């Protein structure tokens, strides 16, 4: 469906290589494969399989954005409850980890046993709200992790960090 050849230079450290693939057809059983000419170790830092054409050019699939638009909702909240709470205070979502180049954003483990890339971050959320002419409702952590999963309250110091993150998010949005 698509192919990209990358000439890799031997290195003892991590090097970034970019490759853009455009599928020439649709195959619901298609696979993404890496092939090497010789024995080597490959470390993948960030892979994104996003469509070339997105809603207003801002990264969201057109069909999903249109579904949201057709709800005629007045606002969208970001992020969701369990994501903002996290499993514990180390992986509770914070504003600063959701902005900047997507390949530099840290991923985090979610309570549903998979990871989020934070590819849809705060900036993309604000852009989506603007594109859909909806109000943005930012949800911040109130100093505790998910109570349904034996979570607990954060220390005063950690809670202050999350409060500062919320203020930074508001400043960013304005």
Feature locations, PLM:
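Non-catalytic accessory regions flanking glycosidase/transglycosidase catalytic cores in CAZymes
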Residues: 1-174
